[in-house]
UniProtKB/Swiss-Prot annotation:
Name under which the protein is recorded: Pup--protein ligase
Organism: Corynebacterium aurimucosum (strain ATCC 700975 / DSM 44827 / CIP 107346 / CN-1) (Corynebacterium nigricans)
Keywords: ATP-binding, Ligase, Magnesium, Metal-binding, Nucleotide-binding, Ubl conjugation pathway
Active site: 68
Pfam families: Pup_ligase
InterPro entries (alphabetical): Pup_ligase, Pup_ligase/deamidase
GO molecular function, one term: magnesium ion binding
Biological function: Catalyzes the covalent attachment of the prokaryotic ubiquitin-like protein modifier Pup to the proteasomal substrate proteins, thereby targeting them for proteasomal degradation. This tagging system is termed pupylation. The ligation reaction involves the side-chain carboxylate of the C-terminal glutamate of Pup and the side-chain amino group of a substrate lysine.
Keyword Nucleotide-binding belongs to the record: yes
């Protein structure tokens, strides 16, 4: 069997994070005026701005909360170093912004405007505007990101088969409304580049490591959907972790370089059978399903070689099992083995039940409403949330892990240092400034430390900052 190379570090324990932007709206009834997303967002962030004089803060769990361009609330999770930990903090982000929405409803009611505030964890609004779910993976500085990105492109353009959230794509010209696998496939136009909005790439190459730039880079993946189902999220991130480990190790991964890969991503989204034909650079062709099958087989072999660090190999074996079952379901078109785990399968099944009653037309407005409601993050109101509460979908983590992540930073990474710093600053009402790598006590005289290693969760320099704060209470 193939043996990993010793030529470069393989990050079995890898720093990761997810950035989630939320769509926002509010109900309007009984002659109420329609509130713009900007107005709703201002009400949503009013308590944050009142407390911190900013709409861009680090929360108690060391995640970043801010108002992004287009009036989208966004949470960037704190640094995580294992799969289940990352899912817990991503779900904690949902809970945090939901709390803000509930508070915004109370504020509006106090002002005589009783209405519901909705936050949607999706990627496209009714006007066709797109907002993202961005994945971040630490890689070594020695890695040429464009080369790594090129090697990953066949995986990335076909990954929607296993982890797309699905959506009804409205009619376009002569093309009727239809169900597609991914909400982001129509929104990316390049493979690997430094752009983010004008011509969104699959992988962004801007050099912002949020750490020691001599040692680390950050791979920023823009193409992914915002998942509601925890197992789908685990498959999206877990399969990507395995791909990165194999490529870093020089493990034998099939050469599946696709000719003009970005040209095929939209065709793949239209085909839930995975039979979309992909021409190969070396001649011949393959299919989207075959690409995923070959990479899944390689990942299963890799499990026998990987170092036991970060995400446990037993958990990644669960990822590979779900990966295999999903590909088998696509191959046979019998989805009964994954219809409680894979987002697009769950959503399509729900929509098909209603579509049959409504005459089979994907353009029916009732279906668009169901599609959107799937992504409402309010417990007991959002459609996916109701399925989860009724035990009709599978979980990857439990509620206790999410609850613990709402107010406590990850304890295994640099986020722990930031969380402790923020906790003491809140306790002492100290004026501080924080970003991903720096912590600064502003008064009486500025004192700053930079923490450039995201893997380190203990550092005596933090004690110096905390002692300085405590010796100048109220400064």
């Amino acid at each position: 069997m193939e043996q990993p190379s010793d030529s470069a570090p393989v990050y079995a324990r890898r720093i990761m994070g997810i950035e989630t932007e939320y769509g926002i709206t509010a109900s309007a009834s009984n002659g109420q005026r329609v509130m713009s997303p900007d107005e709703i967002a201002r009400v949503l962030f009013r308590p944050i701005v009142s407390k911190y004089s900013s709409s861009n803060i680090f929360s108690p769990n060391a995640s970043r909360l801010y108002l992004d361009v287009g009036s989208h609330p966004e949470i960037a999770t704190a640094e995580c170093d294992s799969l289940s930990q990352l899912i817990a903090y991503e779900r904690a982000g949902d809970a945090m912004v939901n709390r803000m929405a509930v508070q915004a409803e109370e504020t509006l009611a106090d002002e005589g405007e009783k209405r519901a505030v909705y936050l949607f964890k999706n990627n496209v609004d009714s006007a066709g505007n797109s907002y993202g779910c961005h994945e971040n993976y630490l890689i070594g500085r020695h890695v040429v990101l464009k080369d790594l990105g090129k090697a990953l492109l066949p995986f990335m353009i076909t990954r929607q088969l296993i982890c797309g959230v699905g959506m009804i794509r409205p009619a376009k010209g002569d093309d009727p409304a239809c169900f597609v696998l991914s909400q982001r496939a129509d929104q990316v136009w390049e493979g690997v580049s430094s752009a983010t909005t004008r011509s969104r790439p699959i992988i962004n190459t801007r050099d912002e490591p949020h750490g020691d730039s001599k040692r680390f880079r950050r791979m920023h993946v823009i193409v992914g959907d915002s998942n509601m189902a925890e197992p789908t999220m685990a498959l999206k991130v877990g399969s990507t972790l395995l791909m990165l480990e194999m490529l870093e190790a020089g493990f034998e991964v099939p050469n599946l370089s696709v000719l003009e890969p970005i040209q095929h991503i939209r065709a793949i989204a239209l085909d839930p059978t995975g039979r979309t034909e992909l021409p190969l650079e070396g001649g011949g062709s393959t299919t989207a399903l075959a690409v995923q099958q070959e990479l899944c087989t390689a990942a299963e072999r890799w499990l026998e070689h990987r170092e036991e660090a970060g995400t446990p190999t037993t958990e990644l074996a669960r990822v590979v099992d779900l990966w295999k079952r999903t590909l088998q379901a696509i191959d046979t078109q019998d989805f009964s083995s994954v219809d409680r785990e894979i987002d697009w399968v769950i959503k399509r099944s729900l929509l098909n039940r209603y579509r049959d009653r409504l005459g089979g037309d994907w353009a029916h407005p009732k279906l668009a409403q169901i599609d959107l409601t799937y992504h409402d993050i309010r417990p007991g109101r959002g459609l996916y949330s109701v399925l989860e509460q009724r035990g009709m979908v599978e979980r990857w983590i439990d509620d206790a892990a999410i609850d613990a992540a709402i107010d406590t930073a990850p304890q295994t990474t640099r986020a722990k240092l930031r969380g402790e710093f923020l906790a003491v600053a809140r306790e002492l009402d100290a004026a501080v400034t924080v970003d991903w790598t720096r912590m600064k006590v502003n008064r009486p005289e500025p004192m700053t430390e930079e923490f450039s290693d995201p893997f380190v969760s203990e550092d005596p320099r933090l004690d110096g900052l905390l002692d300085y704060m405590r010796s100048h209470p109220g400064s």
